[in-house]
Design a protein with these regions (language model features):
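Hydrophobic, aromatic-rich cap/lid helix
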Residues: 172-201
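Catalytic active-site module of serine/aspartate enzymes centered on a nucleophile-bearing elbow/loop
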Residues: 235-276
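Short beta-strand/loop motif that positions the catalytic acidic residue
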Residues: 206, 212-214
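Active-site loop/oxyanion-hole signature of alpha/beta-hydrolase fold enzymes
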Residues: 55-97
């Protein structure tokens, strides 16, 4: 694994490149307030299968710059960061994917830059059915980050000093709890005020193969959202996870699904141009 960085619109963005020996790239993105640590196990497993996986810390997350201007944290701005990463890597087309926020960013990138996207892996996307639960969860967080800053500065400072664990997904949660209230407030505000997902018409126009991962009993990532998305995308397949944490704690089944999807996606296509 190699760590690199690049500048986009004056901001430094950091990524990790897991080169499994392939020139064909999967960019896999983290969820809201989390970072690349969340997906290290997935990247290791897929790289072991021969796939190249790049994990990007989106602006405000992980090791990337963290300004306090909410306008820089719109989901469409995040999609532009992904395209800038591909430009930096010299990659014409890649498979995009991620968890929650990462899934939505990948969808927006596919809608706005279809020429750069070879396929999609969409884990727990946040769509229309999630709006009430997301509002109940994120608005109090936004208010707490704004009005409870003195206390949150203390708790985030303390959390940043806690030693990290051998569990990368847990470390990602700890990193999220270490964010300053100013940055957290800016991220939440920016994500909430901008477009969250492409329109239904745009989704129906995304023709690349897609794998949609979903589970039940989750208000912020409801199964109905994932099922509807899989029906709206012309070339999508829905895979049901046993739990929200399966891909992080018991990943063997789902990483095989991901690996098979990538292998099929990049497999040479038969030449249909030849005549009898």
């Amino acid at each position: 694994m190699k760590t690199g960085s690049f500048e986009h619109r004056g901001r430094r963005l950091v990524y990790d490149d897991y080169d499994g020996g392939s020139s064909r790239v999967l960019v896999y993105l983290h969820g809201l307030l989390l970072d690349a640590e969340l997906n290290r196990g997935i990247a290791d497993a897929l790289a072991a299968q021969g796939h190249r996986v790049v994990l990007l810390d989106l602006l405000g997350h992980g090791r990337s710059d963290a300004p306090t201007h909410a306008s820089e944290y719109r989901i469409d701005s995040y999609a532009e960061q992904v395209v800038a990463l591909l430009d930096h890597l010299g990659v014409d087309r890649a498979v995009l994917g991620g968890l929650s926020l990462g899934a939505n960013v990948s969808l927006v990138a596919a809608a706005e830059h279809p020429e750069r996207v070879r396929g999609l892996i969409l884990e727990m996307p946040v769509m229309e059915w999630a709006v009430p639960a997301a509002a109940m969860a994120f608005v109090p967080m936004l208010l707490a980050a704004h009005y409870g800053r003195p206390l949150l500065r203390i708790t985030s400072s303390l959390m940043s000093r806690v030693p990290r664990t051998p569990l990368s997904a847990l470390n990602s949660v700890m990193d999220a709890a270490s964010l300053s209230p100013e940055v957290m407030s800016s991220i939440l505000h920016g994500v909430l005020v901008g477009p969250v997902v492409p329109t239904t018409e745009q989704r129906e126009g995304i023709g690349v193969p897609a794998l949609v991962l979903a589970h039940t009993h989750d208000l912020i990532h409801p199964f109905n959202d994932a099922r509807n998305l899989a029906e709206q995308l012309p070339a999508a397949r829905l895979v049901r996870a046993h739990s929200p944490l399966e891909l992080r704690l018991q990943p063997e089944r789902l990483t095989r699904e991901l690996g098979d999807f990538l292998a099929e996606l990049w497999a040479p296509r038969p030449d249909v141009s030849s005549s009898d």
